[in-house]
Amino acid sequence: REVTGAADAIAQAVERAAGEQRPRAVIAAGPDSRLLRAVLEPWCPVPFVAWPGPSLPGWAGGLDLVVVLAPDGGHSSASAVAEAVRRGCQLVVACPPACSVADHAVGRWSSILPTTSGDQLATAVVMLEFLERVQLGPRVDSERVAAALDEVAIACSPHRDLAVNPAKMLAIALADATPVVWGGSVLAARAARRVAESLRRASGRTAIAGDAEHLLPVLEAAAPRDVFVDPFADEPRELRPMLVVLDDGSEEPLVREERGRLQAAAASRGVRVETLTTDAPTEVARYASLFLSGSYAAEYLRLGLVEE
C-alpha cells in the first residue's frame, strides 16, 4: 500500500535522478538506517555508508546521495536532513508528508516519498523501490514482500490452532527460557536483532542476538539439564538459554558452518533449539517474514506472561 501511495513521488524522484550523474556514495542517515545497510551493503555499486547519528559524515557533499527513513516523521532525523540540504547533497526522504522532517527536506535537490503507516519496514520498502529503479539497490518486488507478510499473518493468526501455529509454539517454548537469537545471512542477522528487541519489550527479560562467536560462550556456559528436576514440585531455577535460529534458506558455507557450531554447542549442553523458516522468494521478503513471525511470537509471549 505504501509503495502504491508513493508511486508518483517515486517516479518523479527517479526522473530527477536520471538527470544527474551517479552519486559518488550513498549515505543512509538517521536511526533507521541499519535495515538499509543490511540490504544495500552487499549490492550497492557505489560506496555505501550507514550513519545512524544526528548529522552526516564530514565529507558528504553535492556529489553524494543521502537517503533518510523517518516513518514517524520525528525530530531524530531532522538535523541530518537539514544538513544534507545545506550541503547541497542529493536527498531522498521517506516520511509522512506533513512532519518536521518533510519541512526540513525542502530544497532544490530534495525528493520526498510520502508514507503514512509509521511502519519502519513499509517505509524502507518505499525507499528500496526508489533505489532499485535508479540501479543503486537490488530487486525488491514490494508485492512479494506483501504476499510474504500475508502468509505469516495467516500462519500465525490468533485463530489458528497451537499445533499448526509457529509463533504460538515458539512463545510457549520461550516461556521458561532466555532467548538466544541467531540469523546467518546479513538480513537474517538483522531480523534476529529486531526479534530480540521485540522479545525484550514483550517480556521484560533478557533476550540476546549476535554473531555466532558471541553467542557460543552463552550456550557453552549453560549448565547441563538435570533430568531429575520436577518442574511442578521443585523450586523454579534460573532460566536456561534457548537457541532460536532464523533460517532464511541461506546455504553459504560460512552460514552452514556457524549454524552447525551453534547447534552442536546447544546439543552438548541440552539446550533446546527452535527454528523459524521462510520460503519467501526475495531477500527483503524473507527478512520481513522472519521478523514478523518473531514479532507474533513476542506478542504471544507477552500475553502468556500476564498475571491473572
Where are these regions (language model features)?
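Active-site phosphate/pyrophosphate-binding segments
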Residues: 1-19, 112, 116, 132-235
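Residues at alpha-helix caps and immediate loop-helix transition turns in enzyme cores, especially N-
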Residues: 36, 191, 195, 255-258, ...
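Phosphate-moiety recognition in structured ligand-binding domains
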Residues: 1-13, 89-97, 101-116, 120-125, ...
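Short hydrophobic beta-strand segments
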Residues: 23-30, 176-184, 242-247
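N-terminal beta-loop-helix "entrance" segment that forms/cooperates
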Residues: 35-40, 59, 216-225, 283-284, ...
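Glycine-rich phosphate-binding loops that contact phosphosugars or nucleotide phosphates
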Residues: 19-154, 248-251, 261, 265
